């Protein structure tokens, strides 16, 4: 069970990295809620939003997965045109599909690139 949940999450992360979400098993009512977006509901809305990120994506490097029940928390480095952004993503996997995606990260490299490059905290 644990390995299957991780496989589903890694398919999503590989999809971001390779700029191709066609193999990702999204639930039809998947939700995505991040620091810079309102809560999105439905596969079409989520895929549309994520596809908009593709031009900024350079790499995704997974550091760790933590699995409990149907939840997977994944720590990864999101290498983007804004720099490397450490992300802690909380996923809910239900019936073999991604049901919830909730990323947590510091948005300053995106919202204020000058400030983050100067090292202000």
List where the protein language model places each region:
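C-terminal and inter-domain tail/linker signature
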Residues: 1-121
């Amino acid at each position: 069970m644990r390995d299957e949940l991780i496989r589903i999450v890694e398919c999503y992360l590989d999809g971001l990295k390779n700029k191709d979400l066609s193999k990702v098993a999204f639930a039809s009512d998947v939700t995505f809620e991040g620091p810079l977006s309102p809560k999105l509901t439905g596969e079409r809305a989520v895929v549309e939003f994520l596809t908009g990120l593709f031009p900024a994506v350079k790499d995704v490097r997974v550091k760790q997965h933590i699995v409990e029940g149907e939840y997977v928390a994944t720590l990864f480095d999101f290498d983007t045109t804004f720099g490397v952004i450490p992300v802690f993503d909380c996923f809910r996997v239900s019936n073999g599909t991604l049901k919830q995606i909730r990323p947590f990260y510091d948005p300053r490299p995106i919202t204020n690139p000058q400030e983050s490059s100067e090292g202000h905290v």
